[in-house]
Amino acid sequence: MSELKKKSLTRGQLGAIVGAVAASLLVTAFLGWSITCPCDFTPGGLLFGDRAGEEIADWSFANDVSLCQIQVGGLLPYSVNLNCMATSSGGLYLSCSVCDTKRWAGVVVGNDRARMRLDGTVYPVTATRVMDPDELDRAWVARVAKLRVHNTPINPAPPVGT
């Protein structure tokens, strides 16, 4: 009888095993979700890809890719698909209509460090909300120019003259 007691698990040991299995399943699910998303309108977690070593000064190449992704947050990363566009001087802008309702934009207010993935490469960035009307106009002109090249049914180019 005493041998049987020695071989059985205590409640604490069983709880630890169940907890470890549950934690590993959650980590596996999060990594799987991060690998496949952000996708369409579903946010993702970590952005994987080749890593650029330093921040980029000239983002003009951003106009050559149709989709950009941003990752914000620290402990629990949050990433979304969005439009990004560069001005003729190489400045990078991100589309954010009704920005106050976007989770990623709210996170950036408290922590401006983020990561952008363009064409499989992940870049460190510092995100700043633009409020200056002249700078917003430059970003809008860059957005319209890019959407005329990368026009999709989900993200159509604005009508000429806007």
Model region roles, listed by residue range:
Residues 1-12:
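N-terminal Lys/Arg-rich, disordered targeting/topogenic segments
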Residues 14-33:
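Hydrophobic membrane-insertion alpha-helices, especially the h-region
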Residues 18, 77, 82, 161-162:
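Generic low-polarity alpha-helical segments
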Residues 24, 99-162:
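Short, structured beta-strand-loop surface elements
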Residues 31-78:
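Short, conserved active-site entrance elements at the starts or edges of catalytic domains
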Residues 47-50, 62-64, 94-96, 103-106, ...:
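A short linear-motif detector with a strong N-terminal bias
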Residues 62-99, 117, 124-128:
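Short beta-strand segments
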